[in-house]
Regions:
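Eukaryotic intrinsically disordered, low-complexity regions enriched in proline and serine/threonine
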Residues: 529-667
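A structural signal for well-ordered alpha-helical segments within the folded catalytic domains
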Residues: 28, 81-85, 159-162, 166, ...
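Non-transmembrane alpha-helical segments in soluble domains
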Residues: 102, 162-165, 169, 231-235, ...
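Short amphipathic alpha-helical interaction elements and helix-loop-helix interfaces
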Residues: 93, 131, 174, 178, ...
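Non-catalytic accessory segments of hydrolases
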Residues: 1-158, 179, 284, 322, ...
Length: 667
């Protein structure tokens, strides 16, 4: 193994270095690789551009800049640079290999963090003969400012990730990787991003497998509440009084990056306290001619219609994600806004009473932490698994990380937690997958080492063959069964492995019942059959809202059995609630051939529609439909809605506790 390895990519030659894992096994490290043109000057807030070539051999022995940010892990100091679009590649072999590739998307609320080795050392994974890639992407307003204009449609950070995947498709073979066997995995905001990448038309065909850890795009905090308000608020905090988007863009485009990021961080903190929302996060983009959109319709629409990557998925969360309590005393404040339950209504009061019984009948501190964890992560993970089960015929492996050892990150960060809260918390599984500098002084027990080896094998086996337990051995003593329509199998990752069914069933049954009554969705088909070609008509809108152009796009998918048409009419309808597995109180839904989503928006501002300002709040939260004798939807109306009103493209936005204070366990 040469000490100064050189590889050639499309832009030129790269010289890396040899690194050593704790076991002594050597691997190649290539760091600070530019996967896009520096997003400086006129490229601020814009989609990434392909990287420029270089002539000499480029030094790839040190990490590149992290995104400009206020570092919440280091006394809230400003760090990083606007020129941050770099990735790192770690590989056991560069000659004649075609190894599985694992691309990690870091978390941090789309506001802080990086893919660097201080938190995400690759050694444990690389030892298992996979190529590991970590990515830096733009954060905060640099990555997620949206003005709903062609110039700044939003989601620049997501498009950074898409550009990184495109670059890897074209170049990872130079590092011994197989571009046709690429797994994307991420935690927290990285989990949200991973689920979005499986749904984005920019990336869903580049992904072979996905691992989604403690966060999905169904989470309310995954989307901005009001992008234009956020942009105006940021500009105003910096001294700009412009209300029009052109004036705001001109001002923010020339503001020094340090001032921009620090002001955004302050605005973000105020938003957390007042609204429990992430200020700069993904949005549902408006469509413009010649402008690529990472996501132009609600994630839920894409998911339930089966237009996500048809790939194996691993998904799960930790036993107790968060330890922070909701500031509000009223339990009704925990109820997701997507349910459309008006505060003070009889329905909301009844639901709050049930929350009291489920979560607060025992130790209140633990109960409130569990309630927050469910509302922020677990309920939507549970819902995502059930939606995905209908949207794909690929295996879904569900897990719950429930191990507390010396390597748990929370032990280092929050040593004074109450005893009942010392469970596996948000991000605790990461230190059993990555080597972290923060834990270098921690002496792991033999059990910790065994758990780490077990976790690494599960994750890398899945990346290799799409099955985390292809063989049983000393470490993998249980054959992990994927979720099925009959059983919600889940692997409990504790001191010992255990295959359980329907984790947290009592609590999830309550939420299933609540969603089935108040969140309306057509029943999904028993098995999704995608058409061989789907014609999608997109309308290009003038700023006034009038349609000025109509285009048709063809997407290639799988075979189709028959074509179905929906007609707007007014016969006597039948209400179809959201399907819930094995709940006797909920009537058995009738299968239909095509899924359409409607989210209740009673009392919700137009600005609270996951960034989609094209939609107005509806006067009713019901979808009504009539079925043919063959079970297919025939005629569709919505109660109290005009016939010409198109199908919804959004889901409601919840309002919850300060996400980062929850992560930190502060009171």
């Amino acid at each position: 193994m040469t000490d100064a390895p050189i590889v050639r990519v499309a832009q030129g030659a790269l010289q890396g270095r040899v690194a050593n894992a704790p076991s002594g096994k050597a691997y190649y490290s290539f760091q600070g690789i530019p996967y896009a043109k520096p997003p400086l000057g006129s490229l601020r807030f814009k989609a990434p551009q392909p990287p420029e070539p270089w002539e000499d051999v480029r030094d790839a022995t040190a990490e590149g800049n992290v995104s400009a940010q206020v570092d919440h892990m280091a006394n809230k100091q400003y760090i990083g640079d606007e020129n941050c679009l770099f990735l790192n590649v770690y590989t056991p072999s560069i000659e004649g290999s075609s190894l599985p590739v694992m691309v990690f998307i870091h978390g941090g609320g789309f506001s802080f963090g990086s893919g660097n080795t201080d938190m995400y050392g690759p050694a444990y994974l690389v030892e298992k003969d996979v190529v590991v890639v970590t990515v830096n992407y733009r954060l905060g307003p640099l990555g997620f400012l949206s003005l709903h204009t062609p110039a700044v449609p939003g989601n620049a950070g997501l498009k950074d990730m898409a550009q990184a995947l495109r670059w890897l498709r074209d170049n990872v073979h130079s590092f011994g990787g197989d571009p046709a066997n690429l797994t994307v995995f991420g935690e927290s905001a990285g989990g949200v991003a991973t689920s979005l990448l499986t749904a984005s038309p920019l990336t869903r065909n580049l992904i072979s497998k996905a691992i989604i850890q403690s966060g999905t795009a169904l989470n309310s905090w995954a989307f901005q509440n009001d992008p234009l308000h956020n942009a105006r608020q940021l500009a105003r905090s910096l001294g700009c009084d412009a209300e029009d988007v052109e004036g705001i863009l001109e001002f923010l485009s020339t503001t020094p990056v340090k001032d921009l990021v620090e002001a955004a961080s302050q605005t973000t903190e105020e938003d957390f306290i007042q609204r429990g929302a992430i200020t700069f996060a993904p949005v549902v983009e408006r469509e413009f001619p010649g402008v690529e959109a990472a996501l132009s319709e609600s994630f839920l629409d894409v998911l339930t219609s089966g237009r996500v990557a048809q790939v194996p998925v691993m998904i799960g969360s930790t036993a107790l994600e968060f330890t922070q309590e909701r500031r509000a005393e009223e339990l009704q404040e925990y109820l997701p806004g997507a349910l459309g339950l008006a505060r003070g209504s009889a329905e909301a009061a009844a639901a709050a009473q049930r929350l009291q019984q489920l979560y607060l009948s025992g130790e209140e501190r633990l109960g409130r932490a569990q309630l927050l964890s469910d509302v922020l992560i677990n309920v939507d993970t549970h819902r995502y698994v059930q939606y995905l089960l209908k949207a794909t015929n690929q295996p879904i492996y569900y897990y719950k990380f429930d191990y507390v050892g010396e390597l748990n990150l929370s032990k280092k960060l929050y040593p004074n937690l109450e005893e009942e809260l010392k469970q596996a918390l948000h991000a605790d599984e990461l230190s059993y997958l990555f080597r972290m500098e923060l834990l270098q002084d921690v002496e792991p027990t033999m059990q910790d080492i065994k758990i780490r080896e077990r976790m690494v094998r599960l994750w890398t086996n899945f990346a290799k063959v799409g099955n985390p337990t292809p063989d049983e051995n000393h470490y993998l003593t249980v054959r992990w069964q994927p979720v099925s329509g009959e059983d919600l199998h889940c692997l409990r990752l504790a001191s010992e492995l255990a295959l359980i069914t329907s984790p947290d069933a009592d609590r999830m049954d309550f939420w299933d019942d609540l969603y089935s009554k108040h969140f309306k969705i057509w029943n999904l088909p028993e098995q999704t059959t995608l058409p061989s070609t789907i014609e999608i008509v997109s309308y290009v809108q003038h700023s006034s809202g009038s349609i000025v152009e109509e285009t048709t796009e063809t997407l290639v998918q799988t075979t189709v059995q028959e074509t179905q048409q929906l007609e707007i009419t007014t016969p006597e309808p039948e209400v179809i609630p959201e399907p819930v597995p094995e709940l006797p109180s909920v009537p058995e839904p009738v299968p239909v051939g095509q899924s359409v989503v409607d989210a209740p928006l009673n009392g919700v501002k137009e600005s609270q529609v996951n960034g989609n300002h094209d939609k107005k709040p509806r006067t009713s939260n019901e979808i009504k439909m009539v079925q043919n004798s063959n079970g297919n939807p025939k005629d569709v109306i919505r109660a109290n809605d005009p016939p010409e009103d198109d199908l919804p493209k959004n889901i409601g936005v919840n309002k919850f506790v300060n996400f980062f204070e929850s992560l930190g366990g502060k009171k």
